[in-house]
């Protein structure tokens, strides 16, 4: 698996860069596929715009932000990290991420007061949160901002970034994209923490993080 998902030096736009996984892995998972809308802040992460108006994210910047996010999150006590996904496709990736890292997953609806009301039985007091989509997970983002909790967010071209402290530019709507991104983030955090060697992958492939669509 290390050869299949290991770091790779590639030339993009005339520059040689080292990516956390081979470029074709990012591309086949659709991590670079944005939307037909791009907010002002997200323009800095755009590689090009297709003739049909679809914004394409710059994989180099995605890769760079994944490294930054992993180093940042590795500094926190795992039990004080909360990862959130209201949307269905992000729920299994979040659960797998939390299983490996040892943090708390909140999937499905975010109950009001989760981060702000200590009298509630579901109250949680994290030191940092990771959200899968700032729009869908806006309740978590808003409450974290009110409490001064840093927010790391997987952010697509159409997302606004108010109250987001660290943006990771990705396709945050695709099953395969979310699986690969959370897999990479998990691996890099564990490497930063010294829990796995720098040249070692997770025991499961990214597909294990992917939401499974039920066939009827």
Swiss-Prot record:
Entry keywords, A to Z? Ribonucleoprotein, Ribosomal protein
Q: Which Gene3D superfamilies match?
A: Glucose-6-phosphate isomerase like protein, domain 1 (3.40.50.10490)
Q: Which CDD domains match?
A: RPS2 (cd01425)
Please cite one Gene Ontology biological process associated with this protein.
translation
MF terms per GO, please? structural constituent of ribosome
Give an example GO cellular component term for this record: small ribosomal subunit
Q: Coiled-coil ranges per the record?
A: none
**Where do transmembrane segments lie in this chain?**
none
PROSITE patterns documented for this protein: RIBOSOMAL_S2_2
Family designation: Belongs to the universal ribosomal protein uS2 family.
What is the name of this protein? Small ribosomal subunit protein uS2
> Can you name the source organism?
Hyperthermus butylicus (strain DSM 5456 / JCM 9403 / PLM1-5)
User: Gene name on record?
Assistant: rps2
């Amino acid at each position: 698996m290390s050869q299949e998902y290991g770091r790779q030096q590639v030339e993009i736009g005339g520059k040689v860069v080292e990516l956390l996984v081979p470029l074709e892995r990012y591309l086949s998972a659709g991590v670079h596929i944005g939307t037909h809308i791009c907010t002002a802040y997200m323009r800095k992460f755009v590689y090009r715009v297709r003739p049909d108006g679809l914004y394409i994210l710059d994989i180099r910047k995605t890769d760079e932000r994944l490294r930054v996010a992993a180093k940042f999150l590795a500094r926190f006590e795992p039990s004080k990290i909360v990862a959130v996904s209201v949307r269905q496709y992000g729920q299994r990736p979040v659960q797998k991420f939390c299983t490996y890292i040892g943090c708390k997953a909140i999937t499905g609806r975010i109950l009001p007061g989760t981060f702000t009301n200590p009298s509630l039985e579901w109250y949680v007091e994290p030191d940092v949160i990771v959200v899968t989509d700032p729009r869908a997970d806006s309740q978590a983002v808003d409450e974290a901002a009110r409490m001064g909790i840093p927010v790391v967010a997987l952010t697509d071209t159409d997302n606004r970034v108010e109250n987001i402290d660290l943006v990771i530019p990705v396709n945050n709507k695709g099953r395969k994209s979310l699986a690969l991104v959370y897999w990479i983030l998990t691996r890099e955090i564990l490497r930063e923490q010294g829990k796995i060697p720098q040249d070692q992958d997770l025991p499961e492939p990214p597909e294990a993080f992917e939401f499974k669509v039920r066939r009827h």
